[in-house]
């Protein structure tokens, strides 16, 4: 399958290449002006591609040959419904979207996740001071330094990791480093263990149903396939 992609170099382009352990595929994800392009293929396939800049027409060009069974998708950003929260396979993309687009997203799920900021402020105090002075997130190694900072927390309290990641993503969007947001969102969402994702989803459901005043860190015999806790949609659970 031959392909040829040409994009105006003056447009905003975010690209991410990673190996998905869940799908056992190599994934190339691009975002151009709020449109997502995804290319997925098996890791043992030969892929012959190259990326170049054409100075004559000021465009970035991607050319190559992909296996016949390659999956190519194109999706325009769409609102997320509360029903996705009840599907364990959809929760990870919800978190990735929250981290990636913290400045522009809205809705009850995301508003609930924003309450986790209080945990971060309580633990670290001045967030700007943490990002600018301690972690230096705007430096050339800022993305890697941040990932190293939170990696040991991922298995302890995913609430802190999600909150910090969304806040640093918000910071990068404001400082013209938006290209880092997608890479961070994909990495964090894929690094949080299934048990921690289930714990966070369980407590988020409880909060959205009004059973708790905050998103707690409890996990009372909740099986990931058991959606009884998240079965009813109340007025508090409108579409995002």
Curated annotation (Swiss-Prot):
InterPro entries named among the record's database cross-references: Poxvirus_Bcl-2-like (IPR022819), Poxvirus_sf (IPR043018)
GO annotation terms (biological process): symbiont-mediated suppression of host cytoplasmic pattern recognition receptor signaling pathway via inhibition of IRF3 activity; symbiont-mediated suppression of host NF-kappaB cascade
Induction: Expressed in the early phase of the viral replicative cycle.
Entry-linked Pfam families: Poxv_Bcl-2-like
Family per similarity comment: Belongs to the orthopoxvirus OPG176 family.
Protein name: Protein OPG176
Presence of keyword Thylakoid: no
Subunit text: Tetramer. Interacts with host MYD88, TRF4, TICAM2 and MAL.
Protein task: BCL2-like protein which disrupts the host immune response by inhibiting the TLR4 signaling pathway leading to NF-kappa-B activation. Acts close to the plasma membrane and targets several host TIR-domain containing adapter proteins including MYD88, TIRAP, TRIF and TICAM2. In turn, blocks the host NF-kappa-B and TRIF-mediated IRF3 activation.
Residue runs in coiled coils: none
UniProt keyword Nucleotide-binding, yes or no: no
Keywords of this entry: Early protein, Host-virus interaction, Inhibition of host innate immune response by virus, Inhibition of host IRF3 by virus, Inhibition of host NF-kappa-B by virus, Inhibition of host RLR pathway by virus, Viral immunoevasion
Superkingdom assignment: Viruses
Organism, as annotated: Monkeypox virus
């Amino acid at each position: 399958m031959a392909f040829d992609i040409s994009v105006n170099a003056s447009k905003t382009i975010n690209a991410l290449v990673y190996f998905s352990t869940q799908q056992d595929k190599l994934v190339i994800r691009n975002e151009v002006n709020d449109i997502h392009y995804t290319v997925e293929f098996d890791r043992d396939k030969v892929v012959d591609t190259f990326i170049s800049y054409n100075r004559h027409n000021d465009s970035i060009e991607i050319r190559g040959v992909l296996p016949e069974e390659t999956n190519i998708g194109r999706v325009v950003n769409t609102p997320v419904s509360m029903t996705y929260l009840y599907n364990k396979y959809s929760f990870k993309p919800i978190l990735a979207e929250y981290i990636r687009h913290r400045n522009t997203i809205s809705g009850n799920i995301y508003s609930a996740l924003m309450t986790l900021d209080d945990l971060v402020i309580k633990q670290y105090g001045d967030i700007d001071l943490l990002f600018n002075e301690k972690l230096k997130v705007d430096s050339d190694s800022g993305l890697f330094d941040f990932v190293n900072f939170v990696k040991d927390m991922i298995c302890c309290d995913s609430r802190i990791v999600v909150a910090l990641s969304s806040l640093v993503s918000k910071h990068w969007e404001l400082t013209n480093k938006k290209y880092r947001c997608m890479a961070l969102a994909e990495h964090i969402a894929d690094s949080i263990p299934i048990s921690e994702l289930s714990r966070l989803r369980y407590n988020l459901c409880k909060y959205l149903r009004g059973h708790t005043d905050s998103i707690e860190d409890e996990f009372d015999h909740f099986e990931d396939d058991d959606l009884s806790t998240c079965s009813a949609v109340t007025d508090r659970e409108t579409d995002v």
